[in-house]
Amino acid sequence: MPSATSHSGSGSKSSGPPPPSGSSGSEAAAGAAAPASQHPATGTGAVQTEAMKQILGVIDKKLRNLEKKKGKLDDYQERMNKGERLNQDQLDAVSKYQEVTNNLEFAKELQRSFMALSQDIQKTIKKTARREQLMREEAEQKRLKTVLELQYVLDKLGDDDVRTDLKQGLSGVPILSEEELSLLDEFYKLVDPERDMSLRLNEQYEHASIHLWDLLEGKEKPVCGTTYKALKEIVERVFQSNYFDSTHNHQNGLCEEEEAASAPTVEDQVAEAEPEPAEEYTEQSEVESTEYVNRQFMAETQFSSGEKEQVDEWTVETVEVVNSLQQQPQAASPSVPEPHSLTPVAQSDPLVRRQRVQDLMAQMQGPYNFIQDSMLDFENQTLDPAIVSAQPMNPTQNMDMPQLVCPQVHSESRLAQSNQVPVQPEATQVPLVSSTSEGYTASQPLYQPSHATEQRPQKEPMDQIQATISLNTDQTTASSSLPAASQPQVFQAGTSKPLHSSGINVNAAPFQSMQTVFNMNAPVPPANEPETLKQQSQYQATYNQSFSSQPHQVEQTELQQDQLQTVVGTYHGSQDQPHQVPGNHQQPPQQNTGFPRSSQPYYNSRGVSRGGSRGARGLMNGYRGPANGFRGGYDGYRPSFSNTPNSGYSQSQFTAPRDYSGYQRDGYQQNFKRGSGQSGPRGAPRGRGGPPRPNRGMPQMNTQQVN
């Protein structure tokens, strides 16, 4: 019985809790239904969110209580299973264990349902808020558009034509009356007031914005003798009339006619303006063609402005030279050809003259400038008689292009001038030798530059710059008719040679013309330039030159080689004992060689030093004297110079003759071949066939004739 009673008691007790739980579940459902029913009424997402949070909080609290109760019942059940005795209350609680478990499961399921519902509500709230935001933006945009339209209409109402059209209407029905137009004018003064400096701009337009807002809202507030609602209806009537949707011309057709009449005028102006670009293009093409014709990549106007003075100066000098050539006596010799007179076409046609000068300048850019720079600077140079010994040119190297052959100049008219003697610019110039040199001597047929266009502006006339040409004995018949190629200041371009050649061709015309003033037998100056200047200033103090004029020109039809050859003096002693060597300086005959080699018995036993200039190799191989060991120099050899007969040039003896120690006057060549024999560490003397000398002192030299 007690057990039954307890069981029944427990059963009765267990049957008791479900109603509270059921009541709690119904309350929760009612609470959930209440917000659901209140959702459409409230319409605010914040209230819905707050209610959902409260419902979820109540459910969580019920779940915690049921879990605690279930935990106690589990403990009681375990104690009963162990055989312990429980009191009546504990036994009643154990009897309600199944009810508590069912309520707990129901609460959990309800919590899950409310959680899902809360999420759906949150999504709905977000969507609603977004929709409301869009609707609000659309409403604001619509309001702003209405405000802009209202301002436009109020501005256009100030036009009399618009006011008349609105009074008359488009189809005869008036849109606005005069009273309504007056109301709109008064309202325009409120929404667009004149600037009142007593108020701030923000305050002044704040009042205007209130009037606009009330008009858009259509409030019943009085304004301008009426209300905002009435004004809003008037404005909406104007908008619905669509009067301002189309453009209206109020010039009664005059504006359209003027536009139609002005259109052909504009077209005519465009048609007249079209040929102008064509003319400009034609002018540009002419300028470009001028650039190609001149071959100087300059326009003709630029060229004429830049080169006019120089061309005029060349023309004047050309005329002077031609006149001086024509005035010379031309009956000196029967073999003298008649000079070609320069036709003065260049004066009558400046364009042809300038083109001819350009063509010649283009052909003579390279070697022409070099020869002019090296050959025409005669004013500041000193005359060195040891250098003035002309070598003949090869007369076969003539230019095929037409040249002006100058007549043979009378010796009396030419030799009377003291500045007509060609001078070697520097002793350090590279000497050149002719391939057909035999025994040459100076003769006096003098030649002037032939081509006038190749002259450069100088301080003195070009006819004063002359060169003495040595003639060969077997060329006496053509001695007076040599072409102008022998002039050092005239450039002759061979047709078979390129204008700009990197190598040096000794047979070319410019270098053949250089042979008239370069001497192969000239002593090479020392490598030290201060010594050269010192020596030069020392001997120039006692140097004098004189010129003798002859009444008639002496023709040298045949010159014998035996009359001109002299025996080179010997060299004896040391530096303290100078010896004078008389005689002319003559090139030994060489045949069939471009650069002949002659024996040089006065060199020392050592080979030629390397690395030095060609003209200074003889100096590098000077003797080392027994006294002071000086190597090379000018202070041992003192020659006296005698001039060739009938040369028109005489020279007094040196009062302080020059000394050239350890140096040979004649027979020195710069382009000798090196010897093949070996003698000691340095080998045989390079370029000389003799055996090496055992001694390095000052040897005793014997007289030897150079052939």
From Swiss-Prot:
Residues 58-92, 123-151 form a coiled coil. It comes from Mus musculus. GO terms for biological process: generation of neurons; intracellular mRNA localization; membraneless organelle assembly; negative regulation of translation; nervous system development; positive regulation of dendrite morphogenesis; positive regulation of dendritic spine morphogenesis; positive regulation of stress granule assembly. The lineage of its organism: Eukaryota, Metazoa, Chordata, Craniata, Vertebrata. This is Caprin-1. The modification N-acetylproline is found at P2. mRNA-binding protein that acts as a regulator of mRNAs transport, translation and/or stability, and which is involved in neurogenesis, synaptic plasticity in neurons and cell proliferation and migration in multiple cell types. Plays an essential role in cytoplasmic stress granule formation. Acts as an mRNA regulator by mediating formation of some phase-separated membraneless compartment: undergoes liquid-liquid phase separation upon binding to target mRNAs, leading to assemble mRNAs into cytoplasmic ribonucleoprotein granules that concentrate mRNAs with associated regulatory factors. Glycans are attached at S642, S647. Tyrosine phosphorylation by EPHA4 promotes interaction with FMR1 and liquid-liquid phase separation (LLPS) for the formation of a membraneless compartment that concentrates mRNAs with associated regulatory factors. O-glycosylated (O-GlcNAcylated), in a cell cycle-dependent manner. O-glycosylation by OGT inhibit ability to undergo liquid-liquid phase separation (LLPS). Ability to mediate liquid-liquid phase separation is regulated by ATP: moderate concentrations of ATP enhance phase separation, whereas high concentrations of ATP lead to inhibition of phase separation.
